[in-house]
């Protein structure tokens, strides 16, 4: 099994194969990807769709000297397997294992780290210009999906690249008619019209004939090809940017891919190759439902993904989706917005029930935020469902277009804190710090499912921009209450009180997901625990009261410490006369790698044992055991 694949330890081995061996290799590679992902979980559909393209690129180009930048990067498993990491696939996305995305520190073939979309053309152009300035003669290649082409950054890069006539730059549009959710917007309709038109179908066949018979392209041949293409193919959007447009060609046909890429190698200036692929190619279940098989957990390939037979705790994403539908039922002004994450953000049901109030704006976070601001000026109640890591991409819009004008936009921030297998690129580590410094913002962090629901309701009642952050995955098991209750603005609550005497009294000020482990730590230490709920406005009265009645304060958050929620507590404490020693716990000042979420929290010292250990080391190393029966406040 995998007889050919076992002989490939790097692309040099691949380039020694006879062309006739490449399709059998592709079949083995596709089977290996399916087998590997079924055992570890990970991105599947996108990787099954890039097998032949990956083989062709490494076969034709002299990687790693020629640079390949994979946009988003979740389609790079075939690339990793062909570049010396075949055996590492058994550790994919696991702690101390290989990443699910390209990483420069992992391999010289990973020329640029990616995970967020639409960055590849900018990076590849920088490489192409840098190589030219250094006197190096190499190609720089950006592989970008049709979904990622909805982002403005891709067009900013193309606008710049189009005037770089002597850059050896190739942009490959991997057109699979999918991003994660189906792509949306005028650009995708434009591509669909071009590809489905009768005139274009005939033109495409003519261009493919030209490409298939062309010898290595000399300048004259290139001019003849462009002249012939100009006679039969309508001018495209990409040619208007200054690119030489080639395609579309079948991205699963090595006999089309390889000669075309070999011809492109002889050209200078920005080239644009349009390849058509199918997500899930070669695995019928993934072909039929590429969204379901986009990022599955472990499963049996022979049976496919089966519904869980054990009742699962409700996820925070589900809590949000249910709340949004309930809120829209009660108020016709509620509008839902997602930047191309319908399924991931829990908006499938909302789209079905309220299609006229559902807006998927594509991978366009900047536009999503300002679009929401515009809706708010007309008296609507926009809710932007967005991952914490992607909100970073719209920071100027958040400040300039929403907060500065004090517009009532609700930000439902999913994937706050660590996200497990997706690693540092997707961690929501910074939102508390970058949100709390913005004037007019209200910021809440949910500690359980029902609190999340009520916080979202509270956010919708505010006359200013308001954010509610919540984590990935299942909640704590707390049932949600159908009736809505508005949470008092800027007020936390004490969940447990210490019985320790003066000199040993510890108060833990916990935010969001850190309330539960803080209660566990408090049981071991007999400490007070406050569920702070609001990061902004911080409950200054509660902070100051705890400072007056306790000897030590501890702040705990699943976010960066510098500038985060703990800093807000320190600032509030310093305004009072009662200044106490403070221990601020949170994510470390480094990027946290991928792995099991519980293990990562433990390594960061943010589980119950870790919190208790840090408190003992800082404040109690000189004291006797202070544990006593717990006294929690209902």
Curated annotation (Swiss-Prot):
Upper lineage is:
Bacteria, Pseudomonadati, Pseudomonadota, Betaproteobacteria, Burkholderiales
**Protein name, UniProt field:** 1-deoxy-D-xylulose-5-phosphate synthase
Q: What does this protein do?
A: Catalyzes the acyloin condensation reaction between C atoms 2 and 3 of pyruvate and glyceraldehyde 3-phosphate to yield 1-deoxy-D-xylulose-5-phosphate (DXP).
Q: Which residues bind thiamine diphosphate?
A: 74, 115-117, 147-148, 176, 283, 365
Q: Which InterPro entries match?
A: Dxylulose-5-P_synthase, THDP-binding, Transketo_C/PFOR_II, Transketolase-like_Pyr-bd, Transketolase_BS, Transketolase_C, Transketolase_CS
Q: Which family does it belong to?
A: Belongs to the transketolase family. DXPS subfamily.
Species per Swiss-Prot/TrEMBL record = Burkholderia mallei (strain ATCC 23344)
Q: Keyword annotations for this protein? A: Isoprene biosynthesis, Magnesium, Metal-binding, Thiamine biosynthesis, Thiamine pyrophosphate, Transferase
GO biological process assignments: 1-deoxy-D-xylulose 5-phosphate biosynthetic process; isopentenyl diphosphate biosynthetic process, methylerythritol 4-phosphate pathway; terpenoid biosynthetic process; thiamine biosynthetic process
PANTHER family named among the record's database cross-references: 1-D-DEOXYXYLULOSE 5-PHOSPHATE SYNTHASE-RELATED, 1-DEOXY-D-XYLULOSE-5-PHOSPHATE SYNTHASE, CHLOROPLASTIC
Query: Does the keyword Magnesium belong to this entry?
Result: yes
Q: What is annotated about its quaternary structure and interactions?
A: Homodimer.
Is Magnesium among this UniProt entry's keywords? yes
